[in-house]
Amino acid sequence: ERGKRVEERIEDVDKFWKTGMLNPASNVQFGEGGAGTFSDGKLNTLIHDAFGRGREVLKIFAEHGASRGILYESKPHIGTDVLMKVIKNMRQSLTEMGADIRFHSQVTDLSFSRDGERRRVSTLTVSDTMTGTSYLLPAETVVLAIGHSARDTFAMLKEQEVPMEPK
């Protein structure tokens, strides 16, 4: 996560709304929870979701502190204040299960090794968005949960010829 934790991020967003001063690494677009965190918590019911993914997301939100009403309301809504708590609770659940969530961290490059015909990621170059220093992080499996505003990351992946497909 190139931005800050949601509870730190709110300070940067409030400062922007009050003064117009933008923190490029922590704002409405960047930080834990992404752009949706400050969208006032309106949810899409995904009625036409044949695979039930939307329903599963709503259940996860409810399990982490959102009103259970979102599971049956025609226009589900969490609200920004509650959504920030839900996101914090989700982070806590993930870390309790062993997830390593690194804040102020931007993947700026990938290194690969060969496994026969296949390329496998072996190392990430990670830049600390607060200090500008970089470090190498060995990796066998990587989940890149990239928000829509991280165009620089998409450009790096394209340059590295990482297969991607549109949403």
Where are these regions (language model features)?
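Residues forming the flavin
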Residues: 1-167
